[in-house]
Every structure is written in C-alpha cells, then in structure tokens.
C-alpha cells in the first residue's frame, strides 16, 4: 500500500477514479456478491431494465454503508486499528466465510442430487408395479417435474422467489429491499482503502473512491441481471447442452470459491504473522 499512500499524499489519486470504477466492475465478477440471487430475482419477476438498475443501485448503497460502518467501528474500538493490521484479519475472516460457503454449496448440491435420484428410483418403482390405466379429468393438470434435476441451492431460491412474487406485481420497495440485502457482504480491499484515506485525513477522497468502487460493482450486478433476463431462455432454447452445464455449475462454483478462500486465508495468515 506504500505506492497508494504516496499517491494520496500527492493528491494524484483523483485521477484513478475511472480505474477504481473498473476495478469494482471486475471485482463484481469474482465469486459472491449475490449475482446468482439477483439474476434469479430479475428472471422470476420478469424484471425490466429500470428494475435491474434499481436492484444494482440498492446493492451499491448497502455495500458502501457496510464498508463505512466497519471502518469507523474499527477506528472507534481501537486507536491502533490501522489499515496494515486490519487487512490481513479481514482477509482471514473472509477466507473462513468463503471456504465454509464453498463446503456448504458442494454438500447441499450433492445432497440435493442424491435425494432427487432416490426419489426418481422410488417413482420408477411405483410405476413399475402399478399400471395407471385411469385418467384424471378434474379440469386442471397435475404437473410433476420428475424428469429434470435442479440443484438444491437454485431450487430453494427459485421456490422462495416464486412463492413470494408469483402472480403478483412486484413493488419498488420489494426490489430495493432485495437489493439492499444482496450488498451486505463488504469487500476487504474497499475497507482498507477507506481506512488509509481516513488516516491521511483524506476523508472526501476515501468516500469518493469507495463509492466509485461500489458503482463499478453495481454496473456488474446490473449487467448480470439484465443479461440474465434477456439471454438465459434464448441460450437454453438454442443450445441443448446448456441444462447439462447448469446442473454441474454448482460443483465448479464451489471448487472455485474454495480455492479463492484458501488463497485469501494463506495471504491473510502470512500478513498476520509478519
């Protein structure tokens, strides 16, 4: 952080605001940040571009607010809470959360797939011993989706969103609330930058850089939401292998998230031991 501190003292960091926005956008492509939930939400409510923008801005507000709360809370709790000492601990804590999330995702996906296979075998056994030679004519159809597996994580989000919003018009307050809860996980890098700015009495610059970083993150979230609403169904129709890839995606995601968590944990531990 020596180079960045020097830039701040020279007053040249203002020129890096566009770069910070770009870094925030790239940071949004990393695992996490509730991109899956937000994309699923936009698809479920058949959201418009305006609603996707609103969702991303709400996530930006909560993301920025949490960064400020953690930074100022740490400054109040301990006068010796410096950026150099805070960053490794934040990385280590984040690593524990990320690795735990990766294990949970992998276990839940595996368990959901196993339960689905057991239900399928039981369903096939019943049909083998009972010939259904009667028809149900009740004026409505019983639709059972036994033929396609959906991972437990995606199914839980889909069922929850469908139960809450299916058949009803979604209000702006509901969209804002969903976006606010999606941005509650702070970024250690953004907190560190803000702490450095506070220590150098560059509070306005620190606020601007954090907001710029969050704007970049919001752009990614908005793009994901809008892109999901427009393209997912089209891709599924045109490419038969999309569903197969989607079934395996949680395993790859959990592995990638776990590797990121291990890297952050090692990096944070090395920083603490220095």
From Swiss-Prot:
GO terms for molecular function: monoatomic cation efflux transmembrane transporter activity; nickel cation transmembrane transporter activity. Residues 127-153 are annotated as: Disordered. This is Nickel/cobalt efflux system RcnA. Residues 1-12, 78-86, 196-209, 273-274 are periplasmic. It is found in: Cell inner membrane. It holds the Pfam family NicO. Keywords: Cell inner membrane, Cell membrane, Cobalt, Cobalt transport, Ion transport, Membrane, Nickel, Nickel transport, Transmembrane, Transmembrane helix, Transport. GO terms for cellular component: plasma membrane.
């Amino acid at each position: 952080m020596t180079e960045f501190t020097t830039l701040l003292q020279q007053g040249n960091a203002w020129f890096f605001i566009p770069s910070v926005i770009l870094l925030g956008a790239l940071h949004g492509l990393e695992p996490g940040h509730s991109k899956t939930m937000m994309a699923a939400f936009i698809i479920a409510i058949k959201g418009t571009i305006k609603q996707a923008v609103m969702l991303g801005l709400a996530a930006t507000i909560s993301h920025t607010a949490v960064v400020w709360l953690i930074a100022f809370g740490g400054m109040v709790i301990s006068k010796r809470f410096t950026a150099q000492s805070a960053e490794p601990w934040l990385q280590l804590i984040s690593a524990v959360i990320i690795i735990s999330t990766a294990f949970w995702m992998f276990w839940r996906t595996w368990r959901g797939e196993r339960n689905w296979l057991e239900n399928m075998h039981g369903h096939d056994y019943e049909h083998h011993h009972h010939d259904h030679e009667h028809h149900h004519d009740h004026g409505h159809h019983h639709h059972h989706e036994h033929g396609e597996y959906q991972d437990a994580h995606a199914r839980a989000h889909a069922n929850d969103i469908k139960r809450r919003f299916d058949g009803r018009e979604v209000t702006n307050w509901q969209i804002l609330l969903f976006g606010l809860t999606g941005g509650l996980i702070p970024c250690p890098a953004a907190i560190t930058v803000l702490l450095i700015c506070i220590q150098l009495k560059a509070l306005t610059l620190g606020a601007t850089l954090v907001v710029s970083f969050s704007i970049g993150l919001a752009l990614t979230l908005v793009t994901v939401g809008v892109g999901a609403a427009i393209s997912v169904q089209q891709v599924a129709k045109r490419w038969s292998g999309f569903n197969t890839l989607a079934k395996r995606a949680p395993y790859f995601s959990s592995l990638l998230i776990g590797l990121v968590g291990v890297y952050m944990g090692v990096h944070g531990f090395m920083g603490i031991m220095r």
